[in-house]
Amino acid sequence: MEREFVMIKPDGVKRGLVGEIISRIERKGLKIVAMKMLKLDREMAERLYEEHKGKPFFDDLISYVTSGPVVAMVVEGPNAVEVMRRMIGDTDGAKAAPGTIRGDFALSKARNVVHATDSPEKVAREMSIFFRDDEIVEGYELCHSIY
């Protein structure tokens, strides 16, 4: 099974979209194996977005993601990175397809509700910023039976 790091950004939390986003993830068949709400400090935010350091939007991005609470998650499932990237849609909400998280909820390219790691090679690094190994739950199966 592949893992993916997902973070609901401050605009998603402040607008009450956490439950909707989690529901979409679970309905798609991805399993949440770690989750926490926290307020990022500058150091964590800079580590998460280190690939953008030096770009014109970097300081605004860091200010934005440290402006309020976020919900960090690790999800697991077959092709989790690809599945999650398709679910969230284009970085620019105006270009994101309807039905994707960003297509439905993004306010702008900067305030686009959710972050998800863009490649399997980066997942372990991003997960380690937020979670220790012992915080990731192992060994449970999803049961979609209706009672």
Curated annotation (Swiss-Prot):
PANTHER family: NUCLEOSIDE DIPHOSPHATE KINASE (PTHR11349)
GO cellular component: cytoplasm
Any one Gene Ontology molecular-function term assigned to this protein's record: metal ion binding
Top enzyme category: transferase
Active site (record annotation): 115
SMART domains: NDK (SM00562)
Cofactors, names only: Mg(2+)
SUPFAM superfamilies (UniProt xref): Nucleoside diphosphate kinase, NDK
Catalysed reaction, written as an equation: a 2'-deoxyribonucleoside 5'-diphosphate + ATP = a 2'-deoxyribonucleoside 5'-triphosphate + ADP; a ribonucleoside 5'-diphosphate + ATP = a ribonucleoside 5'-triphosphate + ADP
Name of the protein: Nucleoside diphosphate kinase
Main location: cytoplasm
CDD domains, alphabetized: NDPk_I
Alphabetized HAMAP family for the sequence: NDP_kinase
Function: Major role in the synthesis of nucleoside triphosphates other than ATP. The ATP gamma phosphate is transferred to the NDP beta phosphate via a ping-pong mechanism, using a phosphorylated active-site intermediate.
Membership in a protein family: Belongs to the NDK family.
Pfam families named in the record: NDK (PF00334)
GO aspect biological process, one term: GTP biosynthetic process
Keyword Zinc-finger recorded: no
EC number(s) from the headed UniProt entry: 2.7.4.6
Positions with a binding annotation for ATP: 9, 57, 85, 91, 102, 112
InterPro entries: NDK-like_dom, NDK-like_dom_sf, Nucleoside_diP_kinase
Keywords (A to Z) from UniProt: ATP-binding, Cytoplasm, Kinase, Magnesium, Metal-binding, Nucleotide metabolism, Nucleotide-binding, Phosphoprotein, Transferase
Record's subcellular location: Cytoplasm
